[in-house]
A protein has these predicted regions:
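Intrinsically disordered, low-complexity Ser/Thr/Pro/Gly-rich regulatory segments
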Residues: 1-285
Length: 285
C-alpha cells in the first residue's frame, strides 16, 4: 500500500496535524495481534476534529512547544502528539502517560506509554514508529538506518511492553495511581517497510497492506524513469507523514544521487503549489 497517496494528504496542510493524522490513520507496519483500530482511535467525530485543528493548529503547536525540545527523538515527538489527542479528542480521556512500573525492590521494570479511555473503555496503549528495510524482504534482514535496530528485536520488545501492566508489579502500579485494573493492552505500530522493486512475498507478522517504500543500496537500482518528479531528503523528525514541501526544499535527480544514506521522498507538484510525496525510498549503505 502507498499510504502517501491517500486523499487525506490533499486536504491537511499543518505539519504537526499531518504528523498526528498519520499516527491515527496509517496502517500498522507489522501485526502485533492486538492492534488498536483506526475507528477506535478517531472516534465518530475525530476526523472533523482533525480538520478543525488543521484550520487552527494553535492548541496542538502550543502543546508541542511546552514539551519541546525533543532532542531529535522521533518517538518522543510522536508520543506527545498522541498525548495531545488522548487529552483533547471528543471521545478520549488521558489517564496516564509514561507510567513507570517498578518492582517490589524499587527497580524499574518499564513504562506504559499511555493509559487512556476511548469511548469509555480503558486501554493500555503502546506506540512504536519504525522504518525498516532490507534487500531480501526477509524478517531477519529488516533493519533501520542504524543496523542495530531490527524489526524482530523491536517486535519482541513491544510484546513484552504490552504485558507489563498485567504483571503483579503492573497491577500494583495501576492500583497505586487509582487507574482501572481492566485495561485492554493494544498497540499502535506505525512506520514504513522498505523492500526491493517488485517484492510482494511478505512474511508474518509484516502487514501486507502496510505503508511500503523502495529499498536500495545503489542509486542505479532506482531507475529514475519519471522526469517530472523531484526529491527531498527527509529530516528524521519529518518521517511520520508524507512530505509536503516548497520547491526550494527539493532536489533534482543529479543532486539526490549524492545522498549516501537516508529516507528520501519522491515528489510531484500539486495544484496548491507544494511538492507532495508520492513514494519513499530508503537509501542504505
Amino acid at each position: 500500500m502507498n499510504y502517501a497517496l491517500d486523499a487525506l494528504w490533499w486536504k491537511l496542510t499543518s505539519q504537526p496535524v499531518r504528523d498526528l493524522a498519520s499516527l491515527l490513520t496509517a496502517p500498522p507496519l507489522w501485526q502485533s495481534g492486538c492492534e488498536l483500530g483506526v475507528r477506535e482511535l478517531l472516534g465518530e467525530r475525530g476526523f472533523r476534529y482533525l480538520l478543525a485543528l488543521d484550520a487552527d493548529p494553535a492548541p496542538l503547536t502550543e502543546h508541542l512547544t511546552r514539551r519541546a525540545p525533543f532532542g531529535h527523538r522521533l518517538g518522543i515527538y510522536a508520543e506527545e502528539l498522541l498525548a495531545f489527542w488522548f487529552a483533547n479528542a471528543p471521545h478520549a480521556e488521558l489517564l496516564a502517560h509514561n507510567l513507570t512500573v517498578s518492582g517490589s525492590d524499587g527497580n524499574t521494570q518499564g513504562a506504559a506509554d499511555f493509559v487512556a479511555r476511548l469511548n469509555g473503555k480503558p486501554y493500555h496503549i503502546e506506540l512504536t514508529c519504525k522504518y525498516y528495510g532490507g534487500g531480501t524482504g526477509r524478517l531477519e534482514d529488516m533493519r533501520g538506518l542504524d543496523p542495530k535496530d531490527t524489526l524482530l528485536g523491536k517486535a519482541a520488545k513491544l510484546t513484552a511492553q504490552l504485558g507489563l501492566p498485567h504483571t503483579s508489579d503492573g497491577i500494583r502500579t495501576l492500583r497505586q495511581h487509582g487507574l482501572p485494573l481492566d485495561v485492554k493492552p493494544v498497540s499502535i505500530v506505525r512506520g514504513i517497510g522498505f523492500f526491493p522493486h517488485g517484492f510482494h512475498a511478505f512474511e508474518p507478522p509484516l502487514n501486507p497492506y502496510g505503508w511500503r517504500g523502495i529499498y536500495i543500496q545503489d542509486w542505479a537500482e532506482y531507475g529514475f524513469k519519471r522526469q517530472e518528479v523531484r526529491y527531498h531528503l527527509l529530516d528524521r523528525m519529518a518521517y511520520l507523514a508524507p512530505a509536503r514541501v516548497a520547491e526550494t526544499e527539493t532536489l533534482n535527480a543529479t543532486e539526490i544521487r549524492r545522498i549516501d544514506q537516508g529516507l528520501i521522498a519522491v515528489l510531484e507538484c500539486r495544484p496548491d503549489g507544494f511538492w507532495h510525496e508520492i513514494e519513499r525510498i530508503m537509501k542504505a549503505v
